[in-house]
Amino acid sequence: MASNNNSGISTLYTLHNLHKQQRSMNTSIERISSGKRINHAGDDAAGGAIASRMTAQIKGLDMSVRNASDTISLAQVAEGALDESAKVLQRIRELAIQASSDLYSGEEKLYMQTEANQLIQELDRVAKDTKYNEIAVLDGTFADRRFQIGNQEREAVTLSVGNLRTDKIGVHQVRTDATAGSDYTNLATAALRGTTNTIADEDFTIHGHLGQTTINVEANDTAKDIEGKINNKFDTTGVSATSSTNLKIQGLRTDATGSATLSLTLFGKNTTGRTISAGVTLAQNSVSTNDTDLSDLRDKINAYSAETGIVATLTATKDTVYLTNDEGYDIKLQDLDFADVGDAETHKLQVTGMDARLFDSTGAERLSGSAVNMFDKSFDNSNTQAAGYADSVIVSGQITMSASQSFTATTDYGDGDDGLFESSPGNATLTSVSTISLRTRSDALSSLKVVDRAMDQIHMERAKLGAVMSRMGQAIDNLTNVSTNTSHARSRIEDADMAAESSMLTKSQILQQSAMAMIAQASRIQQNVLTLFQ
């Protein structure tokens, strides 16, 4: 065996292994101290890129969780304000109910109106001043706001909160025969609607905030029938309906002064007519003096109110009687007879309704419109009916469609046709909370519907905000779950296996020590060659 000393091969091999163990030990020390398997791109190029992408995703998810939490905070601020607004509206509603009672004087109702006005101002203040991070949320400007709750561009939620100022909330309404008033006090301005009050076949479509539907009106439907058809579709459209029938009897005049008897058969919701025979005091050729007294007619009609659904009221001058059926049944006055007064030769009686149809004793239609004269002919003293004498009149009702949100109603009838509407109804008209009046019983009752629909709007917005809060809570849970699992996946890629690295470090340390010892041995071997020269 040759003894070569010049190259020092054993020492070179030992140094090479020492350097390898030194690098391995340094890597293990770096991984153990940092906790990461990948500290440089060279440690794992592909793994490093994947881990970096996952880190960006995790940070985006964590920020999305914060965004969702902030969205919940915003919704809580708005919902709390709406809760207070609902309480204010409830108080206004209490005042409206109180003011609708005739137990209070006009001055006392003025006090109620004063409180209502202050509450309305408070509602406006809440709508204007409710803000989150100086962003108003209830004044109508908070529309289509986007909240980023995901790691990607399109992962956002859109939220809009309606305008809850008092001039923007209330009841949206469309009335049939829209040119006429809503109650009997406005009947004098009612417009003609064709040749008959018998409703013709007609389709009209309601476009509500929940959806749209088409209502088929059949010939001879009463206002109550149509009301029922509309309300049956409430869940589809969000639009409800009420109906009422109003009739005014006035213009009782004669060319003589004295007492007479007015008789008729009355139909409302009853199918069997009720005969009314009332004494009437008349002023000669006058409809405006206090000498004309229809009190007995009012009392006789009201005696059957429970059966007919018709309530009669009398004006202060006692010369006009209003008949109202709040359920929308047609009001029919049949077999009308007016006994002569002394030697009177003329009598006159006028009936005013939203849609009145007049018949003579043979059943033939004589006249239709909003104001028809029952008697306007000359008579002799034999109580014989003249040719123009009317035997019966039918008055149909008015339908009011209402919703808390704006809606439209369209009909297949044109302007002037014999349909539900004098003209195309178009968009609903808003009666807002800001216009509430409690000064009269009628105003207070109307205010109830306004407040109720305004509360519906408040409830709708609260429901939207509650839904957003619930959704954000679920989003936070999901985002947290995704972030956690992604972090776990990243950990498996870039985190160091501490047990394995500790073992590797121990191994490297032992091998390093062994290499150092072997270098010493290799040096001695080379020194042994020198003994050959001694």
What is each PLM-predicted segment?
Residues 1-534:
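Primary detection of the long, small/polar-rich alpha-helical "axial" segments characteristic
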